[in-house]
Amino acid sequence: MNEAKFRTWLEKHMNYHTARTYTARCMRIEEKLFIDLDDEYRKDGGSGLLNRLKYSRDEQRQRKQPQCGLKFEENADIYIGMNSLGASVKKYFEFRGTED
């Protein structure tokens, strides 16, 4: 992941703190899933990873942990957490699309 370029690109579209949050979420995905977002983008435009990051309200009601393997604290809202992570990764893939 090209952290610096991504953050600079984000700052053109949103405020500094939001850009840092999106970047940190993407870094968390890379670290916890042992992947590189650039590799995922090259593989299939990121669609495989985005599918792995999907988490439904039904899964939340059933108290299921995410299938991708990410762990959350006991009282965390996993649905919101997973959707925030997915939105950040989707934004990274959007950024990558502007570089091609």
Put a short name on every predicted segment:
Residues 1-12, 41-44:
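C-terminal alpha-helical interaction appendages
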